Amino acid sequence: MDKNLAVIYLSILVGLLSFAVISVFRQILKSRKQEGSFSKLRSKLTKEAGTVKEYYQLASIYSQKKLFTQAITLFQKAIKSAEEQENDTEIEDYITLTYNGLGYAYFAQEQYDLAIRNYKEALKRQPEYVTALNNLAHAYERKKLNSQALESYEKVLELDSKNAIAKRRALSLRRLVTA
């Protein structure tokens, strides 16, 4: 009996260790891939002007690293680059993503008015962009504009009725607004 218990214990331990090793290995690969993209894009964009997509990708990496000041500069360069390029559907999509990313970077720096302005610009370009609507509602909440936040969350729920964040926040805001 004690022998079986030891085998079970060791099997569970080996399983947990295997899971931990695999998780760490996956994280290392993900980090290396991101760092490779980061260094490649950064060196290219310091030598020459880039495309909207390249500026957006590098700015997104800076945002993930929580380097929001650098991200804001790159998001702005992406928008400027888009003005100089011939607009097609892909560029328009990246412009929308860029405005949302710019809003996120401003939000992270607690510059809510600028965040709201950029989220609205993203929504002007793509009115059914659920992520930007969620972000806009969150910025309204931080500014204590509860009725606008509730309205934005309700728009999210019209577009995506299963959005858990919008459901939870809308319920909470309904209580605040009606109280």
What are the language-model segments listed below?
Residues 1-49, 53, 60, 67:
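Long, contiguous interaction/recruitment modules in multidomain scaffold/adaptor proteins
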Residues 44, 78, 121-122, 155-156:
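Canonical positions in the second alpha-helix
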Residues 55-62, 74, 95-106, 118, ...:
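TPR/Sel1-like alpha-solenoid repeat signature
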